[in-house]
Amino acid sequence: MNNIVIVGLQWGDEGKGKIVDYLSENADVVVRFQGGNNAGHTIVVDDEVYKLNLLPSAVLRPGKISIIGNGVALDPHALISEIESLKVKGVDVNYNNLMVSESCPLILSIHKDKEKLFEDLNGNHKIGTTNKGIGPCYEDKVGRRAIRLCDLENADELNKRVDILLNYHNAIRKGLNYQVVKKEEILKEIQEISEKILSYKKPVWKILNDLMKEGKKIIFEGAQGAFLDIDHGTYPFVTSSNTVASQAITGSGLSSNAYIIGVVKAYTTRVGNGPFPTEQKNEVGDSLFTIGKELGTVSNRRRRCGWFDAVLVRQAVQLSGVSSIVLTKLDVLNSFDTIKICTGYKYSGKMYDYLPASHSIQGELEPIYEEFPGWKENTQGKRSIETLPINLIKYIEGLEKLIGVPIHLISTSPKREDVIKLKDF
């Protein structure tokens, strides 16, 4: 099991960062393959809290190689800022342990401007983006006008790419009576960061293939979750990249068989707008929010909270070919008398065992629940299966039956070491 892909199976914020950090102890390389600094991974090591946005979670482990693949939308200023903030905490990030794909499309201020502009134009129909410029950057990539990291090396090529980029963006800005951007402004923005960011530029696809031939253990670290996937998520309330496991190949350049692990919370959360069948706009939701400290790592927005949705997770398992589940934040459920799991939906007299693609239907689905008795016992920080209450074990067994995949690990706190291995992978 040399290659592992780790993906979220809900709407992100499942705790992937901690799990990647935990598993990377026995890995050599960790690769980010999609998303950008709209992702937020929180890791607690020796009571020190680290919040990562672009950097792979293995950056906190000495001797590991961290790679940012071509599928990532790269904000160069954000990356350098994140590196420098870690150095203040004693974490050494350098061009020997961090490599960035030369093909990464760059996020510039013009992308953030466009995202905010169109969110404002959408009024009450906002997607609820992070305003980090991720979507507009991916638009430019698909439109073949993006500036890539490799373009920064050649002044003539860069000038040409900036002209192409501004022809598009300024046409839109003029049409909306928005101030146009001067070429000198974009060039200055890029030149401020070029020297620092280019020191990390590498042919990542080639390095990964060489590392695989050497027998190195590689973890691919997903961002967001399955139902934020641009194709398979709750469209249009999704992110602008593919978040399912197959994107690990496209977004890194390494084509190989991998063992796929899905990470889920013991309940469900979502940031921003969009359908959420099991959302609890009541005391249950308030309790999950308060106990789980459910604020977005990047946006600092309140996460919407609800019961575990086995229909969604089962669908995500199938979309990503998941073989194993890691269950996080079980300790948040300690105080509940009764815990519910969604096992199906009803809509207009019809039963559904999957999430329909239609946005108009998704927002009207009525969840069908199976109830489980709570365990009413403090499980935070527990590290052995023998110490777990019987009702918690029954809850885990119920989840396994409903989603059709074994749960191998559970997490009982944000701390790195608070993990219980239920089964061998």
Swiss-Prot record:
The keyword GTP-binding applies. GO terms for cellular component: cytoplasm. Keywords: Cytoplasm, GTP-binding, Ligase, Magnesium, Metal-binding, Nucleotide-binding, Purine biosynthesis. Pfam families: Adenylsucc_synt. It catalyses: IMP + L-aspartate + GTP = N(6)-(1,2-dicarboxyethyl)-AMP + GDP + phosphate + 2 H(+). One of its GO terms (molecular function) is magnesium ion binding. One of its GO terms (biological process) is 'de novo' AMP biosynthetic process. Its main location: cytoplasm. SUPFAM superfamilies: P-loop containing nucleoside triphosphate hydrolases. The keyword Phosphoprotein does not apply. Homodimer. Belongs to the adenylosuccinate synthetase family. This is Adenylosuccinate synthetase.
